[in-house]
C-alpha cells in the first residue's frame, strides 16, 4: 500500500495532464462495468462518465462510498484520473480516498491510500509500480471522508488508462522501416 502517492491535479478536459497521459496511454474505462454504492437520482454512473465537468456523481448514503470498476478480463492499468472541484462542491469534496484492486470483490487489497487538500481539477493517481502496470479485473475507489466532515460526495469524472499496445508490441515482431525489408514481413 502506498500513502500519499505522486499526485498531480489540474482542471478542464483539455488540460496538460490529460494530454500527456493520452499520448502514450488509452482510456480503458469504457470496457468496464461501473457501479456505485449509492447515487442521488440524476447523479449516477452516467454523469461520472459523460465527459462533462458540469455534471457529477453524488452519493446518497453513509460513508464510505464506493465506485467499483469491473473489467471482463484482467487488464494492465497505468493511471486513474479523478476530477474533483473543491470550489464548486465544498463539503461534498472527497479528502481521503482508498484504491483497492483484485480479481473479485472478496480478494480486494488496498494499494493506495491518499489524502487530498482542497482538490480542484484532475487528480492523477499512477497505478504502475516499479515500471510494472497494475494487473487486475476489479478496481474499487472508496471515499472514506470528505472535507468539512461532509456526508455525501461529488466526483465529476473518472478515467482509467492502460498502455497503448501496438501490433509490434503484441506480436513482439520488429517494425521495419524500409520498403525493401517490409515487403518480406508477411506470407501470402
Swiss-Prot record:
GO terms for cellular component: anaphase-promoting complex. It comes from the Eukaryota. SUPFAM superfamilies: Galactose-binding domain-like. Keywords: Cell cycle, Cell division, Mitosis, Nucleus, Ubl conjugation pathway. Gene3D superfamilies: Galactose-binding domain-like. Residues 4-187 form the DOC domain. Pathway: Protein modification; protein ubiquitination. Its main location: nucleus. One of its GO terms (biological process) is anaphase-promoting complex-dependent catabolic process. It is found in: Nucleus. The APC/C is composed of at least 13 subunits that stay tightly associated throughout the cell cycle: anapc1, anapc2, anapc3, anapc4, anapc5, anapc6, anapc7, anapc8, anapc10, anapc11, cdc20, cdc26 and cdh1. Component of the anaphase promoting complex/cyclosome (APC/C), a cell cycle-regulated E3 ubiquitin-protein ligase complex that controls progression through mitosis and the G1 phase of the cell cycle. Belongs to the APC10 family. PANTHER family: ANAPHASE-PROMOTING COMPLEX 10, ANAPHASE-PROMOTING COMPLEX SUBUNIT 10. This is Anaphase-promoting complex subunit 10. It comes from Dictyostelium discoideum (Social amoeba).
Amino acid at each position: 500500500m502506498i500513502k500519499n502517492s505522486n499526485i498531480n491535479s489540474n482542471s478542464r478536459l483539455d488540460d496538460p495532464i490529460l494530454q500527456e497521459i493520452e499520448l502514450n496511454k488509452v482510456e480503458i474505462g469504457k470496457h468496464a462495468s461501473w457501479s456505485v454504492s449509492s447515487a442521488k437520482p440524476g447523479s449516477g454512473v452516467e454523469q461520472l462518465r459523460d465527459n462533462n465537468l458540469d455534471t457529477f456523481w453524488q452519493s446518497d448514503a453513509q460513508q464510505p462510498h464506493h465506485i467499483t470498476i469491473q473489467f471482463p478480463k484482467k487488464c494492465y492499468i497505468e493511471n486513474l484520473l479523478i476530477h474533483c472541484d473543491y470550489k464548486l462542491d465544498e463539503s461534498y469534496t472527497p479528502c481521503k480516498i482508498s484504491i483497492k484492486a483484485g480479481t473479485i470483490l472478496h480478494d480486494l487489497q488496498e494499494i493506495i491510500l491518499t489524502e487530498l487538500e482542497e482538490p480542484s481539477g484532475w487528480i492523477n493517481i499512477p497505478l504502475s509500480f516499479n515500471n510494472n502496470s497494475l494487473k487486475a479485473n476489479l478496481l474499487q475507489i472508496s471515499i472514506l471522508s470528505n472535507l468539512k466532515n461532509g456526508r455525501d460526495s461529488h466526483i465529476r469524472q473518472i478515467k482509467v488508462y492502460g498502455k497503448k499496445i501496438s501490433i509490434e508490441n503484441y506480436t513482439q515482431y520488429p517494425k521495419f522501416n524500409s520498403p525493401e525489408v517490409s515487403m518480406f514481413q508477411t506470407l501470402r
